Amino acid sequence: MQRFALPTVAFRSGHRCRALLLALGLALAGLPSSPRPAAACTRVLYTSPDGTVITGRSMDWSEDMRSNLWAFPRGIARDGGGGARTPRWRSRFGSVVVSGYDIGSAEGMNEKGLVANLLYLAESDYGQLDGKPVLSISLWAQYVLDQFATVSEAVAHLRKEPFRVVAPTLPNGKGAQLHLAISDATGDSAIFEYIGGRLVIHHGRQYAVMTNSPSFDQQLALNTYWQTVGGSS
């Protein structure tokens, strides 16, 4: 049984607080409480008929990630953990996140209702360093939560590829091969993957479900196939 110290966070909107607690509750429910075979993590975005937006995910990892809840206020000065040439910013929004191995933000929500979820993707290839600033993958989700209120804002910024992501080896010796899903309070969604050294973005409300491998374009193709053979009934 894992124990978590819940931080006190003062967000102005009660509705956002309820959504935050529900989303984090769903995330924590997926964390492994005992050793078990690894299965695929899944992120799901649901918009109810009354407009309520909920993002949930399972964390089907092969070991205890020693996760904790971290609460960050707005105004924190940060850098991307990439040495001398790394992005530097000051957080515009407060956030609550679930840590991974206590070295980075695996997922979370900011005070505007923007949610970020990192899932494993074996096909990730971040490319070669090319002189751009370098951002550690442990700060990728936090970079988004700190600076953007909506999915559209994040997409507009990240599609410019202002940095290169670097992925150090995890404490268990595995590579940190991840893709990023984000959603906001309106139900908008985007998926970010590095495939063949290039950033690929899928942006739209229809991208509501993401799992691990294969890459997201192939996940969409598989979904289309199963719909044609009665897999949705």
List the predicted regions and their residue ranges.
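Long, charge-rich alpha-helical interaction segments
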Residues: 224-233
